Amino acid sequence: MVAGIYDIFNHICEQYFSGEDDNTSDYIAEALMKSVIHSSLIAVNNPEDYEARSNIMWSATWALNTLISKGKLTDWMVHMLGQSAGAYTDATHGMKLAAVSLPYYRHILPYGLKKFVRFAIEVWKVNPHGKSDDEIAKEGLMKMEEWMKKLRY
């Protein structure tokens, strides 16, 4: 289940981190990420929770049908890196994405700082008060890593 959650989340991220867009697709992507975060923490602790699992699957439908990418240029580099890692390991698809996503996002952070700031504030509820944009963005990625660890990454 956890590998699938990482795959779903990265499908959303790779459509979301596409520039400094401020459109309906971004708002939907943020809501989907929040839903996946919320529901995944419940489902991992109680795999029998039908509501949590069904919300994850509903989010997966949106993540995979590319409606949230309309009007955007998208970046599927995390998936490409994950597939490349597949040549050297038999890890599941989602776990490969988990392994490469944070290093990749940290690498591209300077090029998409405004979007990573928005991600930190809107998705991870980072308090921006008294912090630089760089600090806010890095805190968002740190919170993403903390969530991944809670899922037993």
Language-model features, listed with the residues they occupy:
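Phosphate/diphosphate-binding glycine-rich loops and adjacent basic-rich segments that engage nucleotide
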Residues: 1
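Conserved FAD-binding catalytic core of PHBH/FMO-like flavoproteins
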Residues: 4-6
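Conserved phosphate-interacting/catalytic interface
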Residues: 9
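Conserved core segment of the aminotransferase class I/II
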Residues: 12
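Active-site segments that bind and position negatively charged phosphate/pyrophosphate groups
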Residues: 15-142
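Short, intrinsically disordered, charge-balanced linker/junction segments flanking boundaries
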Residues: 146-153
